């Protein structure tokens, strides 16, 4: 395996404050040679300068946009610069553990998979709690309608317990926190669907791969950890609020439903979930409100005052 055989594309998931920690971890924990393409969409000055310095020092290709980019748009920009047999997409808030890349590549080589996902962990301390080990994602036709069936496998388990139970296997679902794809696959499928601004992009790709006859595998020998918010730095907030804005969420929902001809208005509750997820930006304020009003009073205030104001303000600022 030589460097040009693997391109790693890093993009911002929802914030920038983890960029330095994640990039340093990537280099420290990755032994296999790779080409790095880093797509920086509108990061704050401190992060921008750090990435410019690191790009010169380490020799990776930095694509800089002055404006914020939707993650799918950023991945497509990175994909235009990818070379070699495999491309790995990874978010800028993900930590990796030694051997992760070798395990993903080995799985692709031995199975012929079009997509390979690692065992995904989340939260801090890192590599203790499981986010998912693959899952299901398919369209079910029933009662004259088309419905999305989606579920994570083994979410919330302790890593040491889950890892002892799982092994490499075919799956229907991997996520863009980190995944390996065959570069040649995009010659057949085309680029990632840029109409999916904030949600459904991982499901869309998995559905498209399986519809085209490709296979998807989960490789638990590869470990990554998504560092979830909160906290969010003040400099993270503008992008975070756009990334999960009602405008982007609704556009993604409409596009995904239309593309896959779905009957349900909110497939698997995704719109409801991402709308609530955006409110993580309010967590410091919510904590103070609950300290002042108690759990019951604070919850009432959130539902009847804070959340409606946040939603109206988000729609006003990001039409």
Question: PLM ranges: what are they?
Answer:
Residues 24-33:
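Short, acidic, metal-binding catalytic loop of nucleotide-sugar glycosyltransferases
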Residues 25, 38-49:
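A conserved acidic beta->alpha catalytic loop
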Residues 65-82:
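Glycine-rich, basic loop-to-helix element that forms the pyrophosphate-binding segment
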Residues 72-73, 144-181:
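A recurrent flexible, glycine/aromatic-enriched loop bordering the glycosyltransferase active site
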Residues 87:
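Short aromatic/hydrophobic "clamp" motif used to bind/position activated sugar donors
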Residues 99-146:
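Conserved donor NDP-sugar-binding/catalytic core segment of glycosyltransferases
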Residues 121-124, 129-130, 134, 207, ...:
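Active-site-adjacent helix/loop segment of glycosyltransferases
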């Amino acid at each position: 395996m030589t460097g040009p055989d693997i391109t790693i594309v890093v993009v911002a998931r929802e914030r920038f404050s983890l960029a330095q920690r994640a990039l340093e971890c990537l280099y420290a924990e990755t032994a296999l040679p790779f080409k790095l393409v880093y797509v920086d969409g509108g990061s704050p000055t401190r992060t921008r300068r750090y990435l410019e310095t690191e790009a010169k020092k380490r020799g990776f290709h930095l694509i800089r946009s002055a404006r914020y980019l939707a993650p799918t748009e950023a991945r497509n920009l990175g994909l235009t610069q990818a070379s070699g047999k495999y491309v790995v997409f990874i978010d800028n808030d993900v930590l990796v553990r030694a051997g992760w890349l070798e395990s993903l590549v080995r799985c692709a080589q031995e199975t012929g998979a079009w997509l390979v996902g690692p065992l995904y962990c989340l939260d801090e301390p890192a590599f203790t709690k499981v986010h998912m080990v693959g899952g299901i994602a398919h369209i079910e036709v029933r009662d004259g309608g088309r419905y999305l069936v989606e579920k994570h496998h083994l979410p919330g388990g302790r890593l040491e317990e889950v890892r002892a139970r799982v092994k490499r296997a075919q799956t229907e679902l991997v996520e863009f926190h980190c995944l390996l794809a065959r570069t040649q696959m995009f010659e057949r499928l085309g680029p990632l669907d840029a109409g999916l601004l904030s949600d459904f992009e991982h499901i869309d790709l998995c559905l498209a791969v399986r519809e085209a006859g490709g296979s998807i595998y989960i490789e638990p020998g590869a470990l990554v950890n998504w560092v979830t918010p909160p906290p969010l730095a003040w400099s993270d907030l503008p992008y975070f609020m756009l990334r999960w804005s009602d405008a982007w969420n609704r556009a993604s929902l409409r596009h995904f439903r239309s593309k896959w001809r779905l009957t349900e208005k909110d497939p698997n509750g995704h719109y409801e979930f991402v709308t609530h997820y955006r409110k993580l930006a309010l967590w410091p304020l919510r904590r103070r409100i609950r300290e002042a009003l108690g759990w019951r009073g604070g919850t009432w205030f959130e539902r009847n005052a804070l959340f409606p104001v946040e939603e109206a303000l988000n729609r006003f600022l990001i039409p």
